């Protein structure tokens, strides 16, 4: 896996380990279970892919937030999807902080340095054992992740992406 913007390269083995560490953190620290929703506000990166597969390992649904939306619009999305946790890229710190303060969440995380009550992504992964969490078999109709979309006339609406859709693609 290559992030052309940062130049970071991650092998599939490292991707699997880091996704397992993220899954372990969510399970052990935030008590995330299958079906829980994890909202992520970040640019595409290798970390983003790790989070996507970390959610998949637990059966959690990753909510891919559109970073182009204003904070008030993002609040509407979070009110709709009711996430258990919020992860944001440090470049979206003001929005991430505003959203994390507006909702009761089991977990909060930023891709930068940890701070009071907010985990840092790299520090969180380093705390975990690194033991592989196997990805269980998923039914075709199980939701893997969710996007929000809207035209010019209305609020963003959730679009579910199932495991079956992923296999067809």
For each feature predicted by the language model, list its residue ranges.
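Adenylate-forming
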Residues: 15, 19, 38, 55, ...
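Conserved pre-ATP/AMP-binding loop-to-beta segment of ANL
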Residues: 128-148, 155
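Conserved AMP-binding/adenylate-forming
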Residues: 8, 25-72
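AMP-dependent adenylate-forming
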Residues: 1-11, 40, 113-116
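Solvent-exposed alpha-helix faces
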Residues: 20-24, 79, 91, 154
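Conserved AMP-binding A3 loop
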Residues: 9-13, 144-168
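Structural core segment of the AMP-binding/adenylate-forming
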Residues: 57-127
């Amino acid at each position: 896996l290559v992030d052309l913007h940062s130049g970071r390269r991650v092998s599939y083995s490292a991707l699997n380990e880091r996704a397992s560490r993220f899954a372990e953190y969510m399970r052990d620290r935030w008590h995330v279970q299958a079906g829980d929703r994890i909202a992520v506000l970040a640019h595409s990166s290798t970390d983003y892919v790790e989070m996507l597969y970390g959610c998949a390992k637990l059966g959690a649904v990753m909510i891919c937030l559109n970073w182009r939306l204003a904070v008030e619009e993002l609040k509407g999305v979070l009110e709709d999807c009711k996430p258990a946790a919020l992860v944001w890229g440090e470049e979206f710190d003001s929005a991430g902080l505003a959203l994390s303060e507006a909702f009761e969440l089991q977990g909060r995380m930023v891709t930068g340095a940890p701070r009071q009550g907010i985990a840092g992504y790299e520090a969180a992964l380093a705390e975990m054992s690194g033991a592989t969490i196997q990805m269980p078999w998923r039914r075709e109709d199980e939701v893997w992740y969710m996007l929000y979309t809207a035209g010019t006339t209305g609020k963003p609406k959730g679009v579910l992406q199932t495991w079956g859709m992923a296999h067809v693609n």
